[in-house]
Regions:
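Surface-exposed receptor/substrate recognition regions of extracellular proteins
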Residues: 1-68, 72-74
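A recurrent domain-boundary module in secreted/ectodomain proteins
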Residues: 39-45, 338-347
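Structural signature of tandem-repeat unit edges
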Residues: 60-74, 84-97, 107-120, 130-143, ...
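Consensus positions within tandem repeat domains that build extended binding/scaffold surfaces
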Residues: 77-79, 99-105, 122-128, 145-150, ...
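A structural signal for leucine-rich repeat
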Residues: 309-314, 335
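Acidic glycine-/aspartate-rich tracts in secreted/extracellular proteins
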Residues: 325-330, 336-337
Length: 347
C-alpha cells in the first residue's frame, strides 16, 4: 500500500502485473524515473481514472525503460523527463496538452507525429530530445513556449501551425535540420536565441506584424535570405542576424532607432544599406566583416547616430559613407565616425 512518498511492494511478486500510485501529482514523475521491475516481470504504473495512465510495455533485464504507453488528456510536468532509454510513447488522440518538461531530456525518444488535438506545448516540453523527427505540429497550437524544441537536431518541420502568434526564447535552438521557408502570418514576436544555429532555415520574408526580435534570434542561420524587415520593428538587439551570409537587406524600417552590437556581423550578402531617419545608435561591430559592403547611405538621418567600436571593420575596399552635406563635418568629427572620415562623403 502507498505510504508517504513510497510504494511498498510485497516480498513475493508472483503473478503481479501492476503497481497503483494513488497520488500521481506528487509521485508519478518520481517513480517513473526509477526502474520498475517486479521479480523480472514487466511492471506498470497506474493512476486513478482522473489522472494520467502510464504503462511500461518493454523493460529490459536491466530494468531500463524502452517504450511506454500513455492514457489521459494532459501529459503532466516532468512526466517522462530524464528517461534516457525511452524510445517511443503511444499517446491517444484526445491528448490536448504537454506540460513543462514533459519529455525533457529523452535522448532516444523517436516521435514522427503528435496527437492532432494538442493545443499547448509547455516550456522545455521536448528539449534535448535528439532523436525527435517531427515533420509537423498540431494545427491548434497558437504559441511555442521557451526551449520547447531546443537541441532537437533531427526535427524536420517544414511549416508551423497558422495560428501561432509567438515563438519563445530558445524554442528551436540547434534544430539544424529544420527546413522552414515561411512563418505564420500572425506572429508578432520571436524570442531570444529562437532559431540560433538553424542551418537549414530558408526564410526569405518575415511576417509583417512582427514587432519584436530577440537577441541572437537568427544567429548563424546561413541560409536565411531576407530582403526586408517588418515595418514595426523599432530596434534590433545584440547579434540578431550575426553570421547570416545570405541576407540581402538594403533598407531598414523607418521607425528603427537602434541596431545592436554584432547585429549583422559577417553579413557578407550586404552590399549597400540605407539607414533609417529615426536611427540614434549603432552598436559595436554591428556590420563588421561585411566584406562586400560598399555603401552605407545615411542621407535620410536627421542627426548623427552614436557609433560603437569597429562597426564597419573589414568592409569592402571601396566602402563609403554618404551623409547629408550640411552635417558632413559633424559626422567626420563624431566619436568612432572619425575613424572613417576619409570615407565620409557629403551629398
Amino acid at each position: 500500500m502507498p505510504s508517504g512518498n513510497q510504494v511498498i511492494l510485497p516480498t513475493s511478486s508472483k503473478g503481479m502485473r501492476k503497481v497503483t500510485i494513488q497520488k500521481p501529482d506528487t509521485l508519478l514523475s518520481e517513480n517513473i524515473k526509477k526502474d520498475v521491475v517486479i521479480g523480472g516481470v514487466t511492471g506498470a504504473l497506474e493512476a486513478p481514472p482522473t489522472g494520467p495512465y502510464i504503462e511500461y510495455t518493454s523493460i529490459a533485464s536491466s530494468g531500463r525503460v524502452f517504450t511506454a504507453k500513455f492514457r489521459g488528456t494532459i501529459v503532466p510536468e516532468y512526466a517522462f523527463a530524464y528517461l534516457a532509454e525511452l524510445t517511443s510513447v503511444d499517446m491517444p488522440d484526445n491528448v490536448i496538452a504537454i506540460g513543462d518538461n514533459g519529455f525533457y531530456r529523452c535522448p532516444k525518444l523517436s516521435l514522427t507525429s503528435l496527437p492532432s488535438g494538442i493545443t499547448s506545448l509547455g516550456d522545455y516540453a521536448f528539449a534535448d530530445c535528439s532523436m525527435l523527427t517531427l515533420t509537423s505540429l498540431p494545427s491548434g497550437i497558437t504559441s511555442l513556449g521557451d526551449y520547447v524544441f531546443r537541441d532537437c537536431p533531427r526535427l524536420a518541420l517544414t511549416s508551423l501551425p497558422s495560428g501561432i502568434t509567438s515563438i519563445g526564447q530558445y524554442a528551436f535552438r540547434n534544430c539544424s535540420k529544420m527546413v522552414l521557408t515561411s512563418l505564420p502570418s500572425g506572429i508578432t514576436s520571436i524570442g531570444d536565441f529562437a532559431f540560433l544555429n538553424c542551418y537549414q532555415l530558408s526564410l526569405t520574408t518575415l511576417p509583417s506584424g512582427i514587432t519584436s526580435i530577440g537577441q541572437y534570434a537568427f544567429n548563424n542561420c546561413p541560409r536565411l535570405a531576407l530582403t526586408a524587415l517588418p515595418s514595426g520593428i523599432t530596434s534590433l538587439p545584440t547579434a540578431a542576424f550575426q553570421y547570416c551570409p545570405k541576407l540581402a537587406l538594403t533598407t531598414f524600417p523607418s521607425g528603427m532607432t537602434s541596431i545592436g552590437a554584432y547585429a549583422f556581423k559577417q553579413g557578407t550578402g550586404l552590399a549597400s544599406i540605407t539607414l533609417p531617419p529615426a536611427l540614434t545608435a549603432i552598436g559595436n561591430q554591428a556590420f563588421a566583416n561585411c566584406y562586400n559592403l560598399k555603401v552605407c547611405d545615411c542621407t535620410e538621418c536627421t542627426a548623427v547616430p552614436t557609433l560603437g567600436a569597429s562597426v564597419f571593420q573589414n568592409a569592402h575596399a571601396d566602402f563609403k559613407i554618404l551623409v547629408p552635406s550640411a552635417l558632413e563635418e559633424e559626422w567626420k568629427a563624431a566619436a568612432n565616425w572619425s575613424s572613417y572620415a576619409s570615407q565620409i562623403i557629403g551629398v
